[in-house]
């Protein structure tokens, strides 16, 4: 009762990386609250396959739901598993990835339990809250932090009265790590039929296709990112050339993607991917909160911008004050001369 829960996604018998990231964060939240970390995973043929991918992240108790029809994911059975289990266990916090599955499952579960959900959080913390209207004081609430109003401010959202406090987080926002402390590491295997009625399985997935990623933006050690200041699709061609020389990948701000200069799967930020490269070169990017949320944990940040007051310069380690179309060709020329 009153524990922290994480819903773990699987692709076949492989646990999603975002789930392991949330387990790491969930363990920290559970420690702060003095409660246990519990995890849920549902699929087909996963018993004996997923435990070693989940328990090492500090899980006290893992609920493994294994039955035909639970993979590939469909809405009804997974919703009933979580809703009925949460009614029994009464968690204080429930987390899941802000993925295609999480965006479908999270609202269904929170609506069924009349709790509430904050999507696409960039940080999760524990803190107190004073309700000025009622005069009530709440301790140990989940601070659900995310950009709001088009990314112009950062909002901290709390859910004082309803449980569980639910949040989704994008892949790459949190960092995963094996837990070195003490925890129970217990796995249980509930009977699926007690949680899921037979009619939930009326939908059958006939074909399941997973498309391979076109690039490794999230895993790249060097990212060259362009914003609206790059000026054109041709300008991005130069960024691709620079990234190739540096053995890196190209990313972009939302403004550049909306302009049609680069594909959406390269968008970095709150509505794109989160990256943690060793070096992040921001070219013509102003640095709205929404974008910074997706790259602020980079090792070294280099800003190329003709505006000395651009917000991104405040978090940059190095600033090159100049036009992208002047600076980038010089960088390319330099690296070509010195990489031979």
Language-model region placement:
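N-terminal glycine-rich FAD/FM-binding segment characteristic of electron-transfer flavoproteins
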Residues: 1-340
């Amino acid at each position: 009762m009153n524990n922290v829960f994480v819903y773990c996604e699987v692709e076949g018998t492989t646990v999603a990386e975002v789930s392991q990231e949330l387990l790491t964060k969930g363990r920290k939240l559970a420690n702060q609250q003095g409660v246990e970390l519990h995890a849920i995973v549902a699929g087909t043929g996963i018993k004996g396959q997923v435990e070693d991918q989940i328990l090492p992240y500090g899980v006290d108790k893992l609920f493994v739901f294994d039955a035909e029809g639970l993979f590939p994911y469909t809405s009804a059975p997974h919703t009933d598993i979580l809703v009925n289990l949460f009614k029994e266990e009464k968690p204080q916090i429930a987390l899941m990835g802000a993925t295609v599955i999480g965006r479908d499952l999270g609202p269904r579960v929170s609506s069924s339990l009349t709790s509430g959900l904050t999507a696409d959080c960039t940080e999760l913390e524990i803190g107190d809250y004073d309700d000025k209207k009622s005069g009530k004081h709440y301790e140990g609430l989940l601070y659900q932090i995310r950009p709001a109003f088009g990314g112009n401010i950062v909002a901290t959202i709390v859910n004082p009265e309803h449980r569980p406090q639910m949040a989704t987080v994008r892949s790459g926002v949190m960092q995963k790590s094996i837990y070195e402390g003490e925890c129970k590491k217990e796995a249980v295997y509930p009977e699926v039929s007690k949680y899921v009625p037979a009619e939930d399985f009326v939908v059958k997935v006939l074909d399941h296709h997973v498309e391979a990623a076109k690039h490794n933006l999230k895993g790249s050690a060097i990212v060259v990112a362009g914003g609206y200041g790059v000026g054109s699709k041709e300008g991005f061609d130069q960024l691709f050339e620079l990234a190739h020389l540096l053995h890196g990948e190209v990313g972009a701000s939302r403004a550049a993607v909306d302009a049609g200069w680069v594909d959406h799967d390269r968008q970095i930020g709150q509505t794109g991917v989160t990256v943690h490269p060793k070096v992040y070169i921001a070219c013509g990017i102003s640095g709205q909160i929404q974008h910074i949320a997706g790259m602020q944990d980079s090792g070294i940040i280099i800003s190329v911008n003709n505006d000395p007051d651009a917000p991104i310069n405040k978090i940059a380690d190095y600033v090159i004050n100049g036009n992208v179309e002047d600076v980038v060709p010089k960088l390319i020329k330099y690296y070509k001369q010195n990489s031979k």
